Amino acid sequence: MEKSKNIWSLILTEIKKELSEEEFYVWFENLCFLESIGDNIKISTPNLFHKNQIEKRFTKKIKEILIKNGYNNIVIVFTNQPPKTHSNKQETKNPALNETFSKFDKLKEKTTSKEAIQNIQDRIKMYIKKEEEEEPTNFKNPFLKKRYTFENFIIGPNNKLAYNASLSISKNPGKKYNPCLIYGGVGLGKTHLLQSIGNKTEELHHNLKILYVTAENFLNEFVESIKTHETKKFKKKYRYLDMLLIDDIHDLQKKEGIQEELFHTFNALYEDNKQLVFTCDRSPSELTNFTDRLKSRFTRGLNVDISKPNFELRAAIVEKKAEEDGINVPKNILNLVAQKVTTNVRDLEAAVTKLKAYIDLDNIEIDIEIVEKIIKEIIIYEKETTNEPNNKINIENIKKILLRELKITHKDIEGHSKKPEITKARHIYAYLLRNFTELSTVEIGKIIGGKTHSTVLYSINKIDRDRNNDKEINNLITELMNKIKKN
C-alpha cells in the first residue's frame, strides 16, 4: 500500500511541474488515493464528469511518468466511487507524503456533499471554457511558402520514392508513413518536399493544425521560452498540432536540452497519431551527438533518401527554370549547364539565374564561353562556401594533407595495421571525409581499405568525442581542417 501511495505522490509531483497552480488545483486538488489492487492504483474523483475529463487530459502523461520511472506495469484507475468515510489514516515514512494524504483525508469529508460536488464541477466547466477562449481561432503557419508545391517539383529516379511518400502523407496524415525522415545532401529538394507536404495537407484538410519550422527556429523558440518563463506555452503550441514538419534536424546535434524537448514532443504527437516529418543531411544512423532514444524514434517509420540528380533530371530542371525565367537559349547551352553542374538542384538554378542576368543586364547573346565562365564561378563559390565538395580531387587533397601531416603512407591508411598511430590516422581520415564530403559511411569505408559502415561510424564518433575531451586532438583536427580548406 505504501509503495502505491509513493507512486501516486510521484505522479502528482511530476505533473505539478508542468501545470500552473490554477490547473493543478482544478484537476488534482480534489482527487483522493482510494486503494491499490495488484498493479492497479485506484484514485477517487468527485464525480463522473471529473473522471472523464481527467482521463481524457492526463492518461497519456501519467503513463509517460510511470514508464520513465520504471513502473511499466502500474495502471492508474480513476473512479467516481466516493472515498471511504472512516478515518483510515494513511501514515508513511515520508513527511511530505503524510501532509499530502492528511489533506486528502480532509477532502473525503468535504467532497461527498452534493453542493461540494456541484461546485467542483462548475469550477472545471469554467476552466474548460476559459481554455477554449484562449485557443487561437485561426491557426497561422508563417513559415510555409506557397511557391513550394508537388506540381512544380521535378521527379526523377533520385527522388521518386521521397516524392511519392510525401504526397501520400499529405493525403492521409498520421496513417501510413509516420514518422517520416527525408535525408540527403544540400540543395536536393528536401525543403521543397517538406513545404509541399504542408501546403497540400492544408489544401486537403482545412481543419488540421500544421506547423513547418526549421530546427534552428525550433531551438531559438525553445530558448526564448526558457528566458521568458513561458515553456508551458511552448509545449502547448507544439504538442497539440496535427502535423509537425521540422527542417534540418541535424542542426540539433550536440544540443541535449532541445533534444530532450523534441523527444517528449515527438512522443506526445506520435502516441496521438499526429503526423511527424523531418529532413536531415544524413541518415539517422549517421547523426553524431544525438541521443539514441531520439534516433530510434526517427527510424520507427519511413526513412527515405534523395540522392544527386542524374543528367536527365538535371537537364529537365534547367529547362524548367529557363522556361520560368523566360530565357530563350539553344538547348545545347542548357545541356552544357546540366552536364557541368553536378552538385545539386540549387546550383543548377543559380546557373540559370546567372544566365538571365547576363541576358537582361549586359544584353549579350549567350554562348558556350559565357556558360563556361558562369559554371566556373558557381563551382568556385561552392568550394568556398561549403564543407561538402564531393569529387575525386577534393578527396585526394584530404588524403594528401593527412599523409603529409601525420607522416604516414598510402599503404598505412588503406591497410590493416593495428599500430595505434595508424589506427588513429584512419579514424581521423574517416572524420575528415565525413565533414568535407557528401559520402555515406559505406562509401567512406570503401576508400579506407574496405571498412564497414559500423567501423566508419565508430571512427567518426570517436574523433567527435576526443575533440571534446582532448585538447591536443582538437588542435590537430582543427589544423588539418584549416589546411584542407585553404587548399
From Swiss-Prot:
DNA-binding listed as a keyword: yes
Transmembrane region(s): none
Annotated region (Domain IV, binds dsDNA), positions in chain: 360-487
Region (Domain II): 79-142
UniProt GO MF annotations: ATP binding; ATP hydrolysis activity; DNA replication origin binding; lipid binding
Binding site for ATP: 187, 189-191
Gene3D superfamilies: 1.10.1750.10, 1.10.8.60, 3.30.300.180, P-loop containing nucleotide triphosphate hydrolases (3.40.50.300)
Compartments reported by the entry: Cytoplasm
Keywords: ATP-binding, Cytoplasm, DNA replication, DNA-binding, Lipid-binding, Nucleotide-binding
NCBIfam families the UniProt entry points to: DnaA
HAMAP family in alphabetical order: DnaA_bact
Domain notes: Domain I is involved in oligomerization and binding regulators, domain II is flexibile and of varying length in different bacteria, domain III forms the AAA+ region, while domain IV binds dsDNA.
Family: Belongs to the DnaA family.
Function recorded in the entry: Plays an essential role in the initiation and regulation of chromosomal replication. ATP-DnaA binds to the origin of replication (oriC) to initiate formation of the DNA replication initiation complex once per cell cycle. Binds the DnaA box (a 9 base pair repeat at the origin) and separates the double-stranded (ds)DNA. Forms a right-handed helical filament on oriC DNA; dsDNA binds to the exterior of the filament while single-stranded (ss)DNA is stabiized in the filament's interior.
Protein name in the entry: Chromosomal replication initiator protein DnaA
Species of the source: Borreliella burgdorferi (strain ZS7) (Borrelia burgdorferi)
Protein encoded by which gene: dnaA
